[in-house]
Curated annotation (Swiss-Prot):
This is Very-long-chain 3-oxooacyl-coA reductase let-767. Substrate binds at residue 189. InterPro entries: NAD(P)-bd_dom_sf (IPR036291), Sc_DH/Rdtase_CS (IPR020904), SDR_fam (IPR002347). Belongs to the short-chain dehydrogenases/reductases (SDR) family. 17-beta-HSD 3 subfamily. It comes from Caenorhabditis elegans.
Length: 316
């Protein structure tokens, strides 16, 4: 009898665990993307300026346009001044009622003195939203010692993917804390959710972004500051090398609008409903099977990239 009661109890516990897992999945997918209305972002920000790093291409540029559409003044930070000027011109042609400023900065420069100079420029305005988007990836997946670009590229990936969200957050948080309002969005990647073979440094740095953001949420949860992780899957951008959009692959503009709509409604998400669906389904797969699937995909991507590289070499 005691054994039977134990088995019945264990069965109820298992059912409860399954029900909780399914509820969490549906909540993560439907909550921020279907059921919950977007918050008043300007009110949550508490200031009229938004800073976007990596703002001249891809997701960062799309964030800048979307924030401008919502009435924020935008301060664009990227490496090349000519591209910053062009992006500024494009934004003002579409949203002439806002102000746009630029700051050229090479994020491969890890010197604290360089960051102090950049922060001095940024803190000239009241920053309500900080989008830490700038990032760098591999040219194509490969094992560590064969990564295209060698140790210089590995160093740059590590520097660009980890220092900006750390140091810019640290340098801008004081004014947000003083106002008891502000929004920080750290753009990571779904690659940080898994131990991605052939993407070792990229995957590891994106895991860093995820952990950093989660810890900052704990540190500032009573300061009126919203700190969010956005970890997208595939978006049609220059860095992803994907040109065509699809049901699972939005362009930057569609993604940025969707992602900003989730601010304040979820603290850690992919930013797009079909990306979230993919993530939740992948999480149901046992780790050893998931690792095998992801590794096979990376091996295929590498093979295609090497074939393309070989064709280009022959055509020269």
């Amino acid at each position: 009898m005691a054994c039977q009661c134990f088995l019945v109890g264990a069965g109820y516990v298992a059912l409860a665990a399954v029900a909780y897992r399914l509820l969490t999945i549906f909540s993560n997918i439907l909550g921020p993307y279907v059921l919950l209305s977007p918050i008043d972002l300007k009110k949550r920000a508490g200031a009229s300026w938004a800073v976007v790093t990596g703002a001249t291409d891809g997701i960062g540029k799309a964030y800048a346009f979307e924030l401008a559409r919502r009435g924020f003044n935008v301060l664009l930070v990227s490496r090349t001044q000519s591209k910053l000027d062009e992006t500024k011109k494009e934004i003002l042609e579409k949203y002439s009622s806002i102000e746009v400023r630029t700051a050229a900065f090479d994020f491969t420069n890890a010197a604290p003195s360089a960051y102090k100079d950049l922060l001095a420029t940024l803190n000239q305005v009241e920053i309500g939203v900080l989008i830490n988007n700038v990032g760098m990836s591999y040219e194509y997946p490969d094992v560590l010692h064969k990564v295209d670009g060698g140790i210089e590229r590995l160093a740059n990936i590590t520097t660009i993917n980890t220092l900006p969200p750390t140091l810019l957050s640290a340098g801008i948080l004081p004014q947000m804390v003083a106002r008891k309002a502000g929004v920080i969005v750290n753009v990571g990647s779904s690659a940080g959710a898994n131990q991605m073979a052939l993407w070792a440094v990229y995957s590891a740095t994106k895991k860093y972004v995820s952990w950093l953001t989660a810890i900052l949420r704990k540190e500032y949860e009573h300061q009126g500051i919203t700190v969010q992780t956005i970890a997208p899957m595939m978006v049609a951008t220059k860095m992803s090398k994907v040109k065509r959009t699809s049901f699972f692959t939005p362009d930057g503009a569609v993604f940025a609008k969707s992602a900003l709509n989730t601010v304040g409604n979820t603290s850690d998400t992919t930013g797009y409903i079909t990306h979230q669906l993919q993530l939740e389904l992948m999480d149901l797969i046992p780790t050893f099977i998931r690792d095998k699937i992801l590794t096979n995909m990376s091996v295929g991507t590498r093979a295609a990239a090497l074939r393309k590289k070989e064709r280009e070499a022959k055509s020269q």
